[in-house]
Swiss-Prot record:
This is Zeatin O-glucosyltransferase. It holds the Pfam family UDPGT. Belongs to the UDP-glycosyltransferase family. InterPro entries: UDP_glucos_trans, UDP_glycos_trans_CS. It comes from Phaseolus lunatus (Lima bean).
Amino acid sequence: MALNDKSIPHETKVVVLLIPFPAQGHLNQFLHLSRLIVAQNIPVHYVGTVTHIRQATLRYNNPTSNIHFHAFQVPPFVSPPPNPEDDFPSHLIPSFEASAHLREPVGKLLQSLSSQAKRVVVINDSLMASVAQDAANISNVENYTFHSFSAFNTSGDFWEEMGKPPVGDFHFPEFPSLEGCIAAQFKGFRTAQYEFRKFNNGDIYNTSRVIEGPYVELLELFNGGKKVWALGPFNPLAVEKKDSIGFRHPCMEWLDKQEPSSVIYISFGTTTALRDEQIQQIATGLEQSKQKFIWVLREADKGDIFAGSEAKRYELPKGFEERVEGMGLVVRDWAPQLEILSHSSTGGFMSHCGWNSCLESITMGVPIATWPMHSDQPRNAVLVTEVLKVGLVVKDWAQRNSLVSASVVENGVRRLMETKEGDEMRQRAVRLKNAIHRSMDEGGVSHMEMGSFIAHISK
């Protein structure tokens, strides 16, 4: 099944085929990248399962009419609810494994596109490399790997794989333990995908040299002569007040009435469920902090967000929402995160530190109270707090199996929102935001990096 699929004129010089990993943070980054490439007048084809194409387009607030979506059927997969006792989203693994069956339809699509264009450029998520493997067998197809993680995280991974060799005068900060970052059953899937990265023509990161310059340079050093592009940030730097169909979320009307930088936004991403007792502690801590807040409290995504029963509704302390009326909002549906972060009333973000969320917060000049849960998130938290110094720790990864008490939540919120320390973080975050925005202007380092990539694939 193909959505918005149009035939390609034979004189088309280059088309781009994007293969995202089927998790919300990955789907979203690929949609942002699609928007940037389409703006260069290059046709973009975006592939996925029927379920995940529907999910991606449903949650994306920007126009997608210029993107050619291809929604393919894959074998049925179980879609269990998230397990709050499991910090890693193991409940999503069946959907990941089902998406590996995209190889055959993607291969057929590649054959078709390669017969209609002079060059086809495949950009696949590093966790979907097996799906793109047939690109190596078609003479006018080039393959690039997109890493949906920070350069800090990935360069650290490579450095450790190489045995931590000395790299001049450069020193990594102390990394948090990898224990608990990835479930055992996911390691095999990841390892199998990484076997195919040797076939690629280069690597792409959603970052900027303004944010992670030294770590991008390390990736270039470690990459065996293959090109590395830091093409980010992918997300829009200016956000429309309404989405593409004219809707504005009610929480934005509430934000309009608040003082500048007075609201902390709390969201822990789309993949991991919190334990009931942890939710109680967060609620109590927020109430005791006396700070304005927007808290997104919804069940983590299932592998198929459209399947099965209604999502779980989390219980809050009795009378909580009545007591915090006027002080805070609890949002139980999908929230417009980028719009919230871009609003002048938002002054902080309590986050799980997924890279997509980190980048959105950094590009909007909002400091982060870190609460990592799995995967790359603990290292992203170190980047935010120790390297960029635009955040503070709420959940210490060294105490990852412990309940975060209400007093710790309260203290973290107060430190970020009402202390000199928090004000200094906000000032650093705004300076970094301004530097990023300048880098995207004509002549800026990020603008030139994108120009370099477009010229490379269009040659």
